[in-house]
Amino acid sequence: MQIDYLIIGQGISGTWLSYYLQKEGKSFLLIDNHFKEAPSRISAGIINPVTGRRHVEVWMAKEILPFAWNAYNQLGKELGISAISQKNIIDFFPGPQMRVSFMQRVEEKGAYVFNYADQHQFHSMFNYEFGCGEIQPVYTAHLETLLPVWRQQLKENTTLLEEEFDISKLNITSSKIQ
C-alpha cells in the first residue's frame, strides 16, 4: 500500500488532520489502538477564550474561535451530527482577588469577559460570597459523538488500522518509509 501520510492516533488532532487530508485528496492511513482513556476521549471538549487566574485572553482567540465554530459545524454537517455548541461559563469567584482580577478585565473591555447581571441568580444552588462573572462565547466540541462517527467513516474508507503503533516496525530509507 502506497500512501502520502501516516497518522498515529485518532484523537482530535488525528481526526482533524485526516479530515483535511481527505478534503485535499491526499492518501493516508491512520493507526489507532482505540485506547479508551486517551485524552481526546475523556476530554470535555471545551474551547475557552480565557485562561488562568488573571483571566487573560488565550493566544489567537479572535482567529481561533470563529475558525473552530465554522470547522466543527462544517464537519458536523457533513457527518449528520451536532459537533459543537455554545455554552458560556459562569465564573464563581473563590476570593476577593479573583473578583478584582476578573472585573479589571471587564473594565479593560476584554472581548470575552462580562459582568454577570444577576449576581444572586445562583445563590439557591451555590455558595459564592464574592460574586460571579461570565465568559463568552465558550464552545463545547461534542467529542463523544464526533470521534466515533469519524472513526466509522475512516473504517468505511479503509483508512483506519485498529492496532497499536509499533515504531520498531517502521523502516526508514533514503527513498521511502515503510
Can you say where each PLM-predicted feature lies in the sequence?
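Flavin (FAD/FMN) cofactor-binding and adjacent substrate-gating region
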Residues: 78-161, 173
